[in-house]
Amino acid sequence: MIFLKSIKLKSNHTQALFSDELYTSFKRFLSPPLHLIENGKNIQYSRRQIEIIHSQNRQQRIKGVVGSGKTTILAARAVEAYKRTKGKILILTYNITLKNYIHDKISQVRAEFPWENFIILNYHTFINNELNNLGVDVSVPEKFNELSLEQKEKYFESNYYSNKQLFTDNAETIVQYDAIFIDEIQDYKRPWMEIIKEFFLVEGGEYVLFGDVKQNIYNNNQTEFKDVNTNVKGFIRLKDCFRSNYKIKDLAVKFQELFFKDKYEIDDFNKIDTSLEIQFERNLEGYVNYMYLQNTDNVSSLYTIIHDNIINKNFIPNDITILSHSIALLKKFDAYYRYSSNEKTNTMFETSEMVNTMLLNKIKTLNSNSLPSWINKMIHLIKRNNDYDTTKAFAEIGILLTIYDLTLAYPIRFDEILNWYCKKCNTSSINLKNLLTIEKEGYDKFKNELNLISKGETIKNLRNNKKLHFYMNSGTVKLSTIHSFKGWESETIFLIIEKKHTNVEATFDEILYTGLTRSRKNLIIINFGNEAYNLKLRGIIETSK
């Protein structure tokens, strides 16, 4: 969640220094371009998809089986809504990362439309912007900074994000939209739906919801009769899976039958004619594998597995995404992978180097007159003591500390790599090791502060920034939590199950289901010692290979 801030930039108030001429000039340069027909692609929609895309039913909820193309329909339906109304179209998600994904899907539609008429945001960012535009002052109670992150979120939720009265008081000045589409509706709280529909939709406007109750990983929406509780009656069901020839679809169905039979409706796929398969085994495409590893180092084992698959299965790095429910393991593996393979990665979270540099800058701000001795010695060690500022020094120290920690854990693999980077920074690995051994107390204190900063609001803002700038076709291996990758999909998924999954026990089945259904074709599940899920998963995966 992005916390509200009291920003005094009220759109309805003019400023003497910001003239109409200057505004027009800014608008001319910053306005999104026109999307042309030739910018799109020839997408082959099914008959059912075409019916929904061109439907003029003003209120609908769409739910569908795995791989039924819900987001593809949303994008095309949004463009059709613009063509009918020539008005403003609002597309909302829960996951901040889906903004780019939905933008790409809309870009694939063969139609001419102005991008400035499409607003794509997650709920919290949208409400933050609207409260700012309305000039609503955001206030916090005394000793707010002493509250836990959860307490802060509850405060903002009750006073702003779910506060209908706040919008009732400002109803006359709210800018409304001709059509509103909400993706991931299973993650929306009922008050959010009511606020969006009652205050931001023009009278008689189009209001369409998309979602899958089995991906209810945040537990924001209390299910009703095994389904999502929404403010639209009934639903349209999509039964055609466009991954029907892939093993991943069969695995998804078996997972539902094992884990969700008493909780949700099992997906009812349209049946495929199997008359030609009587004498022959079905030849499903894709690759499904499962590994259960005990008493092994998670990071080095994971690297070996992924590297071997890239070589033996000819997997392309751009097609690979590594998912887990927690960031800690992913962040450590990210550094291990980059410095072992000499390849870049694309992550939805901060790198170790980023956090090192961030903390170094924070320490400098708090100790402007005298840095801790070990940091001063590091600056001298890499011969950056005569620099105008510490920008380059802290960047290099951030890298060296990351590789140093890897070397402590995996000396055989990283000793030479550390030495190479030390030479690049005008020192040697021997000198670096000696310095950090002598200054162990100071460096240990630094590492303890790293653990604290990783739980703070600054890191949350950094992660949100990483998510906003995440794109699939980076040419590199992607790493993400399952939560952040929800809504996306990848050709090949490495899904990690850690031994413990604290704080997510209530929704871990949904989290796991969401993770495995992110795969378009290939799925490798790596279970690091979680015996309970090993007993549950092994059987259904063996029959899906």
Where are the predicted features?
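Accessory nucleic-acid engagement/destabilization modules that flank
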Residues: 1-21
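N-terminal leader/presequence-like segments
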Residues: 6-11, 136-138, 531
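N-terminal pre-P-loop "Q-motif" helix
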Residues: 18-28, 33-58, 73
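Conserved helicase motor core of SF1/SF2 NTP-dependent helicases
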Residues: 42, 47, 58-129, 179, ...
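A short, aliphatic-rich alpha-helical micro-motif
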Residues: 53-56, 174, 487
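Conserved RecA-like ASCE ATPase "motif II neighborhood" in helicase/translocase motors
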Residues: 131-179, 184, 188-198, 477-484
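Active-site cores that bind ATP or allylic diphosphates and position pyrophosphate for catalysis
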Residues: 439
